Amino acid sequence: LELKNVEKIEDLDHEHTARLVLDMFHRIIIHYALWFNEVKHQMGMEKALDILKKASERSYGIQMKRLSGALGFDMKDGIPLPLLKQSKESLKKLMDLVAVNWLANDGVWFQAVEFTHGMNDAKRCNDSCWAQFSPFEAQAIKNFLNLSEEPGLEGLKKALNFRVYACINTQSIVDEETDSFVFQMNECRVQSARKRKGLDDYPCKSGGLVEYTYFAEAIDPRIRTQCIGCPPDDHPEEWFCAWRFTLE
């Protein structure tokens, strides 16, 4: 399969779908490590180790429960299951599950800090973590797809379809001029859940500015990011946040 001709996850063949599952496991491990590193940086080793214990115990239970239920294995020293014996549909289902576990892991870390040290410290750690995870994920995707060093807006469009979030949320792209496009998050798992509960949007703009700016620049340093709207900003019903990417 020529990956340069692949535009979205569903276009991958069997082998590369399996490779992407493994790559997403790698991403969640790095994200976990970056959370610990930032908590250590912000609060010191002692508090970080205490929070790590709480977060790791909860995170381990959440993730292993989902994985063991989906794959039908008992928890015992880890059980290797050959991914290539799974159908492509099973691999995609597992990939989506890993993505949800990644988001749950993010929430576990956020709440572990919030419940012990307050919302402000949790948001500081969250935004700092994204400043490191976004460039990492961008580089991981560039490596997976064999993108060039400066793949331009078309490279960014493709890369956005391979983020972990692409397995969780519903997103779309609106082309503008030849040197820009708008990326919309039409359904956000976190914000949609809050909406169902009658809660206000979670104010994620500070994190989003870091997340999308750093991701785009890591894909191609010539790309600039503009926030069209992101909570707590008002937004239309069709999207929760929207971002304009321009090639300079």
Q: Which positions does each model-derived feature cover?
A:
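N-terminal accessory segment detector
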Residues: L1-F181, R189-Q191, K195-P203, G207, ...
